[in-house]
Amino acid sequence: MTSTKDKIEKLRKILLKYEYFYHTLNQSIISDAEYDYLFRQLYELELKHKELIPSDSPTQKVGSHILQKFKKIKHFSPMLSLENTFDVNGYLNFKKRIKKSIHNNEPLSFCCELKLDGVAISIIYEEGIFVRAATRGDGFEGENITSNARMIDSIPLKLKGIDIPKRLEIRGEVFMLKSNFIKLNKKYKLNQNKYFSNPRNAAAGSLRHIDPNITAERKLIFSCHGCDFFVKTNKELTTHYQRLMKCLSWGIPVNKEIVICSSDIEIIQFYKKIAQKRNFLDFDIDGIVIKVNSLELQKKIGSTTKSPRWAIAFKFSPKERITTLNDVKFQVGRTGVITPVAYFNPVYISGVMISKASLHNKNEIERLNLHFNDTITICRSGDVIPRLLNVIEIRRCDNAKKIIFPSFCPVCNTELLENIEEKLIRCHSGLTCDAQKKQALYHFFSKKSLYVVGLGPKIINELVEKGLVKNPIDFFYLKDIDLIQLKNVGKRKSIKIINSIKKCKKTTLKCFIYALGIPGVGEVVAGKIANYFIKLDKLMNSNILELNCISGVGKIISNNIFNYFSTISNREMVVKLIKQAGIFLNDQEIHKINSEKTYFFNKKIVLTGVFKSFSRIELKTILLSLGAKISNNISRKTDFLIYGNNFGSKFFRAKDLDVKIINQEELNSLIRIKE
């Protein structure tokens, strides 16, 4: 038994050594075939002597049980995101802020690293043994991915070396090599499976796969970018760089592209160097990360609830690619606006395959002087939105055909009219244009309008195409037998939709105005109009002068409202919706008087978390009916933050700003007081 135990231990040490060289030092000192042979030997020996298998054995990275679900796990300290900048001025402003928060005579150096485009995770080691791993999640709570993280070869299950803390937290990125990503997608295409759009998505999907064995097959890579010692056993480590090097000595992978910079010139030179190397790397990066190197200064500078003040991501300018323009299609929006969209040969930019980009309006087509088959330059603004930058006219063929903005609607063939003030071209045929009809109907029954559960774009499109509906009125006469003939609509779903249509008849003037889809009239403007006119008939009979008196409603929107109710077909439809379809508008005058008496009247409120008693939309509706103003962002002007379970960073931001915080029980009590 002793000789077998020694042999097992020897094989483990050899394999762990090879893994360290390969994954941490990027050195291959053994062939794949030799490694597989040694691995098989160890596997077979451990299979016969299961009592000798430790948790850090190389064999424990395969054959794990299949997870049923991922449980939530709280981080020991928040996993914050980074502030971003795309230019030198942004970096200089960041440095200026740091100088203000410390004494100017203190030496200041920065640790500069690659900003890997991967999935952020946290790993905990106790006594040098891997015990758990979690995704970032919302920064305060992530998913327990321990079983899957064990399958990543570059994550050591047992640390080596000396001075290992009793408890250690490692933070870093999990990513997939571009070469492995291409192989994975080829495999998926052969099996006719849905493939991944970019390496980051592939890494995220693989890391959260229900079967850890699949995670193991995907060849994910981990790279450390930070750590924390819960028991301060390494007092000699005073800088971020020293910590990273210590992690490397323990066998934790750290990317080799790290420099210490003491001047602006050094940082900019490093940024330019990495920008030039970017396209030649086998993994995606989207910039560099600049961190104050001194741990003492990091602590002194501190963090906001969202990001550390001592670090910033200096992102690359949008990447550009040259491709060929194939076509420009003219789309018709809900309000009749014609939007040109360019279609071109697909190009891969910043990890995403792009084949189309909005051209916004007629002016943009004229600016670019577009012709069919033009050679064009494409980029992603902010590494997100596809944009056609310019045309390389020198490559244009002599007989190239110029792209002309249409004079008639591409869907209904109605003559288009140009609004010079708005810089827009519209089809004014309204609901007689199928493209506008479909989108207008979806808007009419959307969540912020007269919400009907289950009535999505696919069902509405099919109802229009089958001639079952032509305008909103027709929906109130639908029967379940009409819906059953549609794709994927059974008896139960049809009844659910019909019942929801009946319920949506009772609404507010604000929701009704918004549902009409008048150009420029969003949710906020609809509320202002409702509060000003109080009654629908007053709005319908208003003139331009009255409309211009409404605060926040400009000349263009006033004209749009006046033109809408001046159109006979629109007026007839509104009257039929009220008198025939039976839409009932809550009395706005009584609502306004009552809302002024409530605790929430005219208060700016922000919501965060999940609420027990009602959905987010229901709660917003209740608060708005009480005269509240709902906002998405916390500021010093916020009156209340109302929070539920699993609240996010807004809660801590509110505390920092001394904003009054209301929990679910207090909220229920306040709502009952009103009632």
UniProtKB/Swiss-Prot annotation:
Cellular component annotations (GO), alphabetically ordered: cytosol
SUPFAM superfamilies: BRCT domain, DNA ligase/mRNA capping enzyme, catalytic domain, Nucleic acid-binding proteins, RuvA domain 2-like
Catalytic residues of the enzyme: 115
Keyword DNA damage attributed: yes
Enzyme class: ligase
Residues that hold NAD(+) according to the record: 32-36, 81-82, 113, 136, 173, 291, 315
UniProt entry keywords in alphabetical sequence: DNA damage, DNA repair, DNA replication, Ligase, Magnesium, Manganese, Metal-binding, NAD, Zinc
Transmembrane segments: none
GO terms (BP aspect): DNA repair; DNA replication
Cofactor: Mg(2+); Mn(2+)
GO molecular function: DNA binding; DNA ligase (NAD+) activity; metal ion binding
Gene3D superfamilies assigned to the protein according to its UniProt record, in alphabetical order: 5' to 3' exonuclease, C-terminal subdomain, 6.20.10.30, BRCT domain, DNA ligase/mRNA capping enzyme, Helix hairpin bin, Nucleic acid-binding proteins
InterPro entries per record: BRCT_dom, BRCT_dom_sf, DisA/LigA_HHH, DNA_ligase, DNA_ligase_AS, DNA_ligase_CS, DNAligase_adenylation, DNAligase_N
Purpose: DNA ligase that catalyzes the formation of phosphodiester linkages between 5'-phosphoryl and 3'-hydroxyl groups in double-stranded DNA using NAD as a coenzyme and as the energy source for the reaction. It is essential for DNA replication and repair of damaged DNA.
Assigned protein family: Belongs to the NAD-dependent DNA ligase family. LigA subfamily.
The protein's name in its UniProt record: DNA ligase
Organism: Buchnera aphidicola subsp. Acyrthosiphon pisum (strain 5A)
